[in-house]
C-alpha cells in the first residue's frame, strides 16, 4: 500500500502498470508477497531443528507457486513485464532480507524447471541498480537476533544489546556464527557493547563512553 502511494505521489515514471489488465496481473503477483514473507520469517526465527525440513518445504512451495505464475504470464521474460515494475519493487526487499535464510539455514532454490523462472526473476530484481541500498553482510549481521527467535528489537536471553543497534555500526562488527541451533553469541562476540552514559557537569549533554575506552 505504501509503495503504491509513493508511486503515485512522487514525480517520475510510474512503476504501476497503466493498462487495466496488466495492473490486475501485477496485483495478483503482489498478493503473493505476504505469504512468502511470513514463511521466510517463521523459518528464520524457528528454534526447533525438527521443523527445519517442514519450513523449508513450505517456503519452496511458495516459490514454486510464483514460478508457475511467471511461467503463465511471462515465460520468456526477465521481469513480469518488459522492465522493473511495481511487483519487483514489492518483492526485492523481501528477497534481500532472505539473505538471512541463506546464511542461517543454508537455504537455496533447487535446480530444475520448478524454480528456473523464479530464480531468473529474483536474480534480476536483486541486481537492479535501484536496489543496492543494502548488502548481504548488513542483513546477516542485523538479523542475527531474528535467527535466535527474537524479533522486532527484542533481546535474546543473556544479551544487553540488540543486533539492530545503530552503534557500533554493522560494518565494524564481525560476522555472527552460522549455526543458530548450537551456538549463541554474546554481545562481545558480536562486536556489540553497552554504552555507559555520563553527563557534562556544565551543559548536561550526554557523553557516551565505551567500557573498553579506558
Regions found by a protein language model. Give the residues of each.
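GST-like domain detector, emphasizing the conserved glutathione-binding G-site
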Residues: 1-83, 119, 150-214
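Activation segment
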Residues: 6, 98-99, 135
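Membrane interface segments of multi-pass transport proteins and intramembrane proteases
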Residues: 16, 108-111
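Short acidic/histidine-centered micro-motifs embedded in hydrophobic/aromatic stretches
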Residues: 29-32, 43, 92, 137, ...
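Short glycine-enriched, charge-decorated loop/helix-capping segments at active-site entrances
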Residues: 45, 107-108
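GST superfamily/GST-like fold recognition
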Residues: 81-105, 114-119, 125
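A contiguous, mid-protein "functional segment" used to position or interact
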Residues: 113-155
Amino acid at each position: 500500500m505504501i509503495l503504491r502511494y509513493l508511486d503515485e505521489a512522487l514525480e517520475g515514471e510510474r512503476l504501476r502498470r497503466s493498462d487495466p489488465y496488466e495492473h490486475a496481473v501485477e496485483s495478483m503477483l503482489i498478493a503473493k508477497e505476504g505469504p512468502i514473507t511470513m514463511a521466510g520469517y517463521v523459518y528464520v526465527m524457528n528454534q526447533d531443528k525438527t521443523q527445519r525440513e517442514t519450513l523449508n518445504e513450505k517456503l519452496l512451495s511458495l516459490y514454486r507457486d510464483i514460478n508457475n505464475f511467471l511461467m503463465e504470464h511471462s515465460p520468456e521474460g526477465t521481469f513480469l513485464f518488459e522492465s522493473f515494475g511495481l511487483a519487483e519493487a514489492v518483492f526485492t526487499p523481501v528477497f534481500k532480507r532472505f539473505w538471512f535464510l541463506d546464511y542461517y539455514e543454508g537455504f537455496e532454490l533447487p535446480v530444475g524447471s520448478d524454480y528456473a523462472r523464479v530464480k531468473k526473476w529474483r536474480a534480476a530484481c536483486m541486481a537492479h541498480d535501484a536496489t543496492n541500498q543494502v548488502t548481504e553482510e548488513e542483513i546477516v549481521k542485523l538479523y542475527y537476533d531474528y535467527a535466535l527467535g527474537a524479533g522486532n528489537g527484542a533481546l535474546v536471553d543473556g544479551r544487553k544489546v540488540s543486533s539492530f543497534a545503530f552503534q557500533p555500526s554493522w560494518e565494524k562488527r564481525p560476522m555472527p556464527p552460522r549455526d543458530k541451533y548450537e551456538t549463541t553469541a554474546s554481545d562481545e562476540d558480536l562486536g556489540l557493547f553497552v554504552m555507559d552514559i555520563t553527563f557534562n557537569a556544565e551543559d548536561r549533554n550526554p557523553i557516551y563512553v565505551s567500557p573498553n575506552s579506558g
